[in-house]
Amino acid sequence: MTADGRPRIPTGILGEAPIRELEIALAGSIVGPGEPNYETARQVWNNAIDKRPALIVRAASTEDVARTIAFARRVGQPIAVRGGAHSAAGFSTCDHGIVIDLAQLNDVQVDVGSRRALAGGGSTWKIFDAATQAYGLATTGGLVSSTGLEHWSRWLRAWRRCRPSGPEVRPHVRQPSVRRVGDR
């Protein structure tokens, strides 16, 4: 809410109460049409893609992701997940739906003993390389430093440039809960 009590985000088709409820539940923030930073927040790498989401949720935790997915299901809105915002086809954004921006989930934890790294969904190759190179480790990805890790991972596995064990994945399924799936 603004100082004068008006909704901070134009509510459009979603309604004020559901958006306010989501905003209170999140550790991250919400950006909507009409806000000063909306135009910048909705941009993706491919300038030919000009979509206007109803909301952009800047997730600060995996719980924010789960809550946003549950919210989108409840209000019947499509979602797009943005990691590095490098989808040439525009899959990291949507018109009139909800974009879950993972940029803040960019931590990288390196286990030197096993020579593995666990990276957040918003990690870019620049962040990943800096974390792994500190331990003398390198990877087969990262052709463009601002590209999100998810952008290349499926292609690299297809070309057998990555180890078949692959990364750990934390899918968000029917229930608004976080599940952890790993290869070991």
Model region roles, listed by residue range:
Residues 1-165:
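N-terminal accessory segments
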Residues 108-109, 166-184:
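Active-site and channel-lining beta-strand-loop segments
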